Amino acid sequence: MVNLHKTWPVLSHYDQQHLACIALPLGGIGTGTVSLGGRGNLQDWEIVNRPAKGFAGGEAFFVLYARAGGQPAVTRVLEGVLQPPYEGAFGARALHHGLPRFRECAFHAAYPFSQVTFADPDVPLEVRLEAFNPLVPADADASGIPVAILRYVLRNQGDVPVTATVCGSLRNFIGLDGQGGEALGGANAFREGGGVRGLFLATTGVDPNAERWGTLALTTTAPEVSYKCSWPKVGWDVPLLHFWDDLSEDGRLEDTPSAPQDTPVGSLAAEVLVAPGGEETLTFLLTWHFPNRQTWTPSKEEGGGTGSECGCAPNRVGNYYATQYSDAWDVAEKTASRLVALEAETLRFVSAFCESDLPQVVKEAALCNLSTLRSQTCFRTADGRFFGWEGCGDKVGCCYGSCTHVWNYEQATAFLFGDLALSLREVEFLHATNEAGLMSFRVTLPVGRAQEFGLAAADGQMGCIMKAYRDWQLSGDDALLHRLWPKVKAALSFCWVPGGWDADQDGVMEGCQHNTLDVEYYGPNPLMGTWYLGALRAAEEMACAVGDGAFSATCHERFIGGSRWLDANLFNGEYYEQRVAPPQEAIADGLRVGMGAQELRDPAFQIGPGCLVDQLAGQYMAHVCGLGYLLDQQHVRKTLESIMKHNFRSDLYGHANHMRTFALNDEQALLMCTYPHGGRPRMPVPYFTEVMTGFEYTAAVHMLYEGLESEGLRCIAAVRRRYDGARRNPFDEAECGHHYARARASWAAVLALTGFNYSGVELAMAFAAREGLHFWANGHAWGTCSIEAEKRDLNVRLSVLGGTLALKRFALTHWDEVVFGAVRLIRAGESLLLHMSGG
């Protein structure tokens, strides 16, 4: 068995039968990624400003040459053997399918750290590939580097020295992006400097303004290298044969001249001698720089282009990372100089998280879904603003605009990268909300066009008000609140316009309510109702903070009335239903998107008496925000019990699903909506037969908050069993596209189980009085909290591992609270010790 890294944590182990679907994204926030496949292969080159599933891109692969003493040398591709199916029109279809690989391979991960172990009886070395990209909470720049770090560890278990070479090869594909384009004038050159040496890939034939223009680099920190800038230009696959023969001869490459090519392949070889019983490491950096990102909503103005090739305004939005680095070589030099520190900071985070006492499935669900932040789902424009698709199609983004009703559910951004969350809030309120209070639930870019979409989603808009409260609390930024408040107030007041969501201003949404299931609900229902109640509570608190007492009182009055009405009229003894009510007056402009019912006298696509999986999503969010109960506490708990009873399936063999399939056969799941007592509309709410992980996590986390721990954990475990590497990719939970944003609701399980809450406004932190080691993060600082029993009391060690934490109060909920005489500042590396007595 090949040894694993001594200090890198591992959450999940995947054997050779569970590798086929693994593709771990390597790259930074807003940079795109190259994925590490389960066999140790590089795939899905999604670095050219768009998704590109299946795109071979640089056709990169790494090869080991090894000679033990006087024995014949062996050469192997540093990948596990190919798995069936092998069939294709011209034989096997994998890249370089005929080359020999390692017979034994396994994958081990705790995102972003991945380890691939290789062994083969014919190879005198055991090999471990260690791959990662820096991920540091509260440091989006350190977590946003366009690099894949690949470290090959060679271990000699024999009794003679082994001469070894690890060689990486990379095709210059600049000009292609996986969907189209043309690579022209590729130019590869060997460089050395800044602690690295290797190949710099550029182009002389692609327009520098094109979205597909950029640079690549393959470098190493190893001192002894040989290279080949370009494989020879000949037919019949002779270039691959020439490369293989050259390396296999003596483990070194000869840089022979080659005729000019548009897509030259370059190779970089690093050499080392591995002593008997010894271990040597060779580190490679794959870096990229494609600065010309285009808007997702191309302007149709004359001269504006289509958004695919034009590199000028109004369609170019650029990439923030490209403002931090001049080209791919600059990325390599700057990363190499900080590599030790970046790895240490990433390790500090991942180790602290993995060593916490959270259940295994919660750690895995929370950590694996952080990969979505680095996928093409998310990006940062040149001005540093953060945006996101809903998810990614195979070749294009899916559902543009930082869609409010989807991004409402996820919690990872706010609690790990608070500055990015604040960027979203500023765009939503200061750019996407018009003077009347209508918030476009999809943002057009550049931000000067943010209101062009011009349609509002009831759940999306209310959720953004709750998120404004959450992010104000986490940051403690009163200036931000005052800046956002006029538009926050307008966004809530928009509910009360004639023909609006709550035109009679009674705290209950009855109007035309577009929502996250892509239709309009007509009449009161629990999903829109709880988002609205949560927004009223959040606005009540924010209004009080800015000195708007009258508006605060209005919000409070409508919250009380709405809460009582929903409990009295929608709760059926088991769960909350929708009371379908066709519109009786003209619908206000901007509320009807057009994807729902066309005949409004008996509207289709309603919930009716159904049991909706996320019917209490607003209450879930209220718990995250610390806003308390929006509805009767016993009704809330009973509803979660009913969702588990009616929507959970121990298998799906008999389940008929007419839409997308994200779970099937022997898999367990929570269905979107069921009709346990009949009454299903002929055309019910869309997706009702489906399964989607973001909704499952929302319900599961809410169960955890309500004390239904075994039920919540069972739901989370059911999700993660479906993403086991053999059935699906553990690092890609799909919904409307790959790497779907909503799935990061999984992070909220960390909050629910630890009871973590932080207010930067009151400088107060709280945890549940639960023994163990807990991980915490507020988006601006992070660390651990250890709670240990001493007789009838509890000893607390609050440690800050990153950022600076300011505190006036610390509490263990329903146990004890400590109030400090002055503000305590706890910096990274410091701890606070407290002795707390139970009541």
Which ranges hold each PLM region?
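Acidic/polar, glycine-enriched structural segments that form the non-catalytic walls/loops
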Residues: M1-T7, H13-D15, I22, Q115, ...
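Solvent-exposed, conformationally flexible loop/turn segments
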Residues: P276-E279, I826-L832
